Every structure is written in structure tokens, then in C-alpha cells.
């Protein structure tokens, strides 16, 4: 999962500083690296490096990124390591001059596409599938003078998740894959048109939300105009669960984890408030897994809104039993287990006056490996909690994700081979309760969702050898 942000200034103003602010608003989507590319109409200028947005970009760097068109990226690695070569945007040479590409998502057929390109003589500078997309586009641009046709022909080869920003010298193009895995939206103000992974970044820049880019839609921005194109092929219907809620986009499979964990609570995805979804999840969770307790406490920050809903529905008072160190990043998206475990100790501190002698309900968004949860429960018990109950605002994660979320291998997923009782014992809680699949879908309010990680049913074909390799 990454964050992408683009601007086209129809008043020909430099956009690098605004992209910086947009990426800062999307920092929760990736903390390993950041990059910005801009175009002044003739040349593309770019800079990228490892680190947070505030670490990568200083005023001098931004001042050297001239241009009225620009794209930016914050990186969270799922394919490729931490090296600066894997940071984005990627800038490649084409028959139209240099082009820059920023990508959010993962392809399931990237290995095959990479091998085909290497056999044709392409040399890759990174290990990411984003560069594969860039090189495919370069080849298609040799065959036609129509940029949109070349992009469509490139997209026909891709299977998986891709929200893309593609910048030519004179235009900005945004793409959302036919499944709509990752969010992407458009905003504008009196001087600029914006493209963003989440609308919270539009709010930061005081821009007006225009629309969500639809699955299978290509948005072309040129000469200050927004032109919509649609892919001329569809995808198979994907309905892994029968729940009486509407579809927003027929055939879509938007990642449910955006609503549960990744997106900022103040964002709205495809017309649905993330905050309201999480509040509803907490209320449904309290109905599905009631418990006698004295305190409801979130595991911050992602558990906060769930815990508020749980408290409201159950009548159990809400307290902050764990305090977060705001200078430590999100533990789930750190790339190694050692880093995650150290981050937990640095990140959270128990409030003894809240927890001591109390029956405590801890509420969190999900359990992936279980190691973080076990450490937190141990921390709460050491603070004097009499009982510790865990409630999870997501069904059990039983299968890996191949679309851009680092959910490890199947054997590392604690729920893939354990019952709820066994998980509770392994983590050290008095009871554990997961949100049901039906409860999740009802809380989100749409059924055109990717639920592969909690059902094992994937919306696209996935190479079986790749699955075995990851297991």
C-alpha cells in the first residue's frame, strides 16, 4: 500500500510545495520512502529518497523541482526492498520524451511480465512491479501516437491492483484498475486540479472534492481540462459473501482493509465515510461479542474509532488505557518482524491508573501475526489489569494479500491454522472476539469489496506457484 498525489496547475504555477503537503497528508500510507516529479512543459525534474516526507524534502530540494504538473509518492514496500532505487516516481525515456509514473498496488502477474520484457532486452533498475508497468508503457508508446490508446493497451496486460499517476511533459493521467482495489479521487481549486489516494489530502490543501475515479476509468488532464476515458473491457463478477447491501460499482473489488485500517478516519472512499464505518464496526462488534467489563480501551491509533462504537453500544466506559508515542510510525507497515516488535515497545505505554484492578476490553482493527497483540496484552497485565478481553474489528485474516498489503505468508498468519480459542490462548487474553464477515460488509455498506484475506477467495487469477512460494 502506498500513497500517490498529483497536481496540474492551469495557471502554470509551481506545484512541488503543494505536492509535498499532499504527501504529508498521505504519510500514513507509507513511511519508507518518498518522491516527487514535476514537469515544466519541456523537461521532467525529480527527486526521491528513503525516509519520511519531511526527511526527504527540504526547501532547497523543492525549489529545484520546477513545473506546473507534478506527481508524488509515499512508499510502503510489498515488492522490492527499501533501496532508493525502489522509491517512486519512476522516470523513464519514451518516444514522447521522459515520462514519470507513480503506482499504488501490486500486480499478481508482474514476474511473468518482467521475464517477457527482459527477454526483449529491457534492463530494470529496481525490483518493483511499478517499473514493469513503466517499461510496458514505453513499448506501447512506440506503436502509436495516441497516449490513451498506449495506456489502454498496457493496462490490458496487467492483472492486479494499480492506481496510477502518469505524467508526460504536457499532461497528467490517472488510472484506477477495473477492480477498483485502491481508492483514487479528483479535487480542484481556483488554480489546480488534484489527484489523490484519499480526499483527506484535498482537505489539507483546501481543495474541493470533485469525484472518485471509478474502477476502469482513465482521467486525462491537459490544458486545464478533465477528460474521462473508460477501459474497453470488464472483469468477472466477484461476490464472496451474500449480504443484503448494495454494490457501488458492479464487478468491483475495493480493498476492505482501506476502511478497516489503511485510510485516515477523516477520508471518504467511494462516497462512504471511513470514520462512520469504523464506528459501526465497533457497535456491531459489541453486539456480536458482549462482555462484562469495566473499561473499553483502544489500541491506538487504529483501534480508537472501533472502541468508541463498542463503548457506545455496550455502555462500558471508554478510557485511554494505552498512550501512543506520536513519533513512532505504524507498526503493521514496518517491513521486518524485529522492527515491528521494537516499535511496539517504543510506541505504546500503559496508563496504570486506568488499567489497575480493572476488567479491560482492548479493541483493535485486526490481528495479522499476533506477536504485536501478545506484547500489548502482556503490557496491560503488567499494569495491573484483572482481566483482558480482546475484540477485533475485522474477521480472521487467513490468506495472504497479493494486491498491495504486506500480510506475510500463510504460515505466518496466526488465524490460518488456529481456532479463536487457540489464538486467545496464544495471545494471553481471557476472551477474544472477531467481527463476523457479514458484520464487516454491513458496517461498510457495500458488497463490491475484496475480501480475499478473510475468505481465501481472490477476485483475480493468482498464480498457484506464487501462492505456494509465499506459503
Curated annotation (Swiss-Prot):
GO terms, biological process: 'de novo' IMP biosynthetic process; purine nucleobase biosynthetic process; purine nucleotide biosynthetic process
Domain Glutamine amidotransferase type-2: start-end pairs: 2-224
Pfam families to which the protein is assigned, alphabetical: GATase_6 (PF13522), Pribosyltran (PF00156)
EC number: 2.4.2.14
Residues annotated as the enzyme's active site: 2 (nucleophile)
Cross-referenced CDD domains: GPATase_N (cd00715), PRTases_typeI (cd06223)
Co-factor: note: Binds 1 Mg(2+) ion per subunit.
Alphabetical keyword list: 4Fe-4S, Glutamine amidotransferase, Glycosyltransferase, Iron, Iron-sulfur, Magnesium, Metal-binding, Purine biosynthesis, Transferase
Cofactor: Mg(2+); [4Fe-4S] cluster
Positions bound to [4Fe-4S] cluster: 255, 401, 450, 453
GO molecular function terms attached to this record: 4 iron, 4 sulfur cluster binding; amidophosphoribosyltransferase activity; magnesium ion binding
Bilayer-crossing regions: none
Keyword set includes Repeat: no
Pathway(s) per entry: Purine metabolism; IMP biosynthesis via de novo pathway; N(1)-(5-phospho-D-ribosyl)glycinamide from 5-phospho-alpha-D-ribose 1-diphosphate: step 1/2
Reaction(s) this enzyme catalyzes, per UniProt: 5-phospho-beta-D-ribosylamine + L-glutamate + diphosphate = 5-phospho-alpha-D-ribose 1-diphosphate + L-glutamine + H2O
Binding site residues for Mg(2+): 302, 364-365
Family: In the C-terminal section; belongs to the purine/pyrimidine phosphoribosyltransferase family.
Protein function: Catalyzes the formation of phosphoribosylamine from phosphoribosylpyrophosphate (PRPP) and glutamine.
Descriptive protein name: Amidophosphoribosyltransferase
Native source species: Methanocaldococcus jannaschii (strain ATCC 43067 / DSM 2661 / JAL-1 / JCM 10045 / NBRC 100440) (Methanococcus jannaschii)
